[in-house]
């Protein structure tokens, strides 16, 4: 009996691969950067040991949706030319005794806007055609520029894979499968790993020489003029009380408002479909009632009855629009909301401090 396959639980990325992805994404910014990642699967942990970028080619004509925005760089991972290029690169890596197992691809993002049709189609292609145990690494260039590396690993859930393969995103099908926008991606924890040689080299690096001990200042004036105090983060600094909004937070709010507006547009389109469907069904009901009354009269006169299913030829019900775009937009709204929640704490604290000083009676309520 074959052993049960261990599900993927984590992703371990070499530091060199992270630096390659950061360099490629920064050089291509604001254009989307994509590339392939190779490594091995060790007991449910996907170890990524190497990467290489994709050349930009034209978007394939067989896109899942005709209204998808053409983006050659974002569509590069599933292009036929790049599939052959990737196979040739992996063959060359295997010849020099490097881990040459395809474990997924990477892409760059700006302000967390990676929930789009290109990412879905690319990851669907990898999990369906290349290797089911693959991941998509998403590097957010703008978030990383704030001083914190943003590198996340995603897979498409099995429930979403089934729905996307059959292209069943109507309201009825979504209710049957209980598919929600939270079920699109499965996020895996990412761990950055260094080899033992690199770790040993880092420990052997010389630490900066300690500065000479400073004498205690004789007075408060001398303390305020001391260069050590001016350079210290603990020194009194009124700039920390500035209420200026972080540009990253401001841009995220703008993108969130745009996504909410898109959500309202999709909702209005679906409501228009429901109104059109109700009108056509009312016409069909009226026609069927009229035909039944006419057949009753003909039956009384012993005349041949008229067919009652002729309405299928006379009336055409409107086709329900796909709910996939709405699901993706909802998932993107959730992504923007999480980013705003993580960045808003510092500004919110300052605003409450100002309110407490200006309106001391309000804080007690």
UniProtKB/Swiss-Prot annotation:
UniProt cross-references to SMART domains, sorted A to Z: JAB_MPN (SM00232)
Major subcellular location class: cytoplasm
Keywords from the UniProt entry: Cytoplasm, Initiation factor, Protein biosynthesis
Disulfide-bonded cysteines: none
Any one biological process term the GO annotation gives: formation of cytoplasmic translation initiation complex
GO molecular function: metallopeptidase activity; translation initiation factor activity
One cellular-component annotation, GO: eukaryotic translation initiation factor 3 complex
InterPro entries the UniProt entry points to: eIF3h, eIF3h_C, JAMM/MPN+_dom, JAMM_MPN+_peptidase_M67A, MPN
Subcellular location(s) of the protein: Cytoplasm
Entry coiled-coil feature ranges: none
Residues in MPN domain copies: 11-160
Assembly notes: Component of the eukaryotic translation initiation factor 3 (eIF-3) complex.
Function: Component of the eukaryotic translation initiation factor 3 (eIF-3) complex, which is involved in protein synthesis of a specialized repertoire of mRNAs and, together with other initiation factors, stimulates binding of mRNA and methionyl-tRNAi to the 40S ribosome. The eIF-3 complex specifically targets and initiates translation of a subset of mRNAs involved in cell proliferation.
Family statement: Belongs to the eIF-3 subunit H family.
Name this protein carries in UniProt: Eukaryotic translation initiation factor 3 subunit H
UniProt organism field: Aspergillus oryzae (strain ATCC 42149 / RIB 40)
Lineage, top ranks: Eukaryota, Fungi, Dikarya, Ascomycota, Pezizomycotina
């Amino acid at each position: 009996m074959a052993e049960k396959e261990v599900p993927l639980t984590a992703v371990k990325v070499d530091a060199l691969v992270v630096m390659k992805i950061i360099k490629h994404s920064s050089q291509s910014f604001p254009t989307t950067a994509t590339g392939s990642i190779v490594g091995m699967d060790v007991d449910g942990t996907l170890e990524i040991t190497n990467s290489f970028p994709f050349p930009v080619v034209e978007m394939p004509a067989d896109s899942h949706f005709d209204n998808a925005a053409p983006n050659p760089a974002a569509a590069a991972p599933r292009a036929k030319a790049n599939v052959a290029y990737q196979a040739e690169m992996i063959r060359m890596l295997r010849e020099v005794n490097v881990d040459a197992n395809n474990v997924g691809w990477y892409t760059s993002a700006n302000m967390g806007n990676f929930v789009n049709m290109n990412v879905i189609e690319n990851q669907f292609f990898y999990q369906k055609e290349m290797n089911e145990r693959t991941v998509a690494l998403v590097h957010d260039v703008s978030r990383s520029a704030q001083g914190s590396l943003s590198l996340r690993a995603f897979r498409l859930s099995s429930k979403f894979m089934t729905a996307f393969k059959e292209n069943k995103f109507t309201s009825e099908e979504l209710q049957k499968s209980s598919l929600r926008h939270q079920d699109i991606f499965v996020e895996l924890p990412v761990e950055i790993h260094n080899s033992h040689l690199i770790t040993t080299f880092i420990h052997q690096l010389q630490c900066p020489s300690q500065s000479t001990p400073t004498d205690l200042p004789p007075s408060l004036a001398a303390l305020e003029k001391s260069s050590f105090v001016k350079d210290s983060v603990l020194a009194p600094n009124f700039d920390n009380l500035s209420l200026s909004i972080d540009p990253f937070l401001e841009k995220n709010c703008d993108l969130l408002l745009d996504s909410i507006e898109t959500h309202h547009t999709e909702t209005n389109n679906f409501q228009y479909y429901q109104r059109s469907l109700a009108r056509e069904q009312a016409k069909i009901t009226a026609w069927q009632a009229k035909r039944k009354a006419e057949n009753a009269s003909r039956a009384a006169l012993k005349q041949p009855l008229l067919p009652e299913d002729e309405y299928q030829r006379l009336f055409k019900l409107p086709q329900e629009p796909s709910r996939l775009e709405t699901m993706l937009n909802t998932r993107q709204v959730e992504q923007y909301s999480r980013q705003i929640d993580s960045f808003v704490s510092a500004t919110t604290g300052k605003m409450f401090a100002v309110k407490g000083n200006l309106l001391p009676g309000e804080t007690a309520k």
